[in-house]
């Protein structure tokens, strides 16, 4: 099963993504591309085909997000341990708060698509804004959440069209919350304003009430692509 990598960093440049940081991140992605082409024969060529991209958060511009698709967490681990990564990552570290990194994988999805099978659907990497919703769920209610979410998922999907949204469970444990699982939904929007219009739609209360009945909290972030 594929996994989607989400790595969120906080810049040390007062809410700015400096040219130096952007250049370091782009170089890291390009070197990663070369490494994948040489070492992972089943991986598609090109960073967009791999879901590898860089985003800046709208709510907090100091937060940048790097993404990629991998066949497994173990496959990603091979890149992390590589000489190539050890060579390029320090240039990124110079520009971020290394004590404030959020890093995890989402199970079973390739969220940052560049093409979609459905005619007219807009891939996430072609979306003006990307939304990430984090649903905190008590572990014992994981199956219940899946059942409830499946019953109302179409409400958001229909409202969001032609943009595509996909979700999966966070693989790594939520730090300091051993009794909590996190379900992550990633998808595109025309704008942040358009995303917020969902809360005013006619079926939102049905969706919201159902989600509230099986979650501890819901956090929503929005991002714009840098690379």
Predicted features by range, described:
Residues 1-227:
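Short S/T/G/P-rich N-terminal loop/turn motif that feeds into the first structured element of a domain
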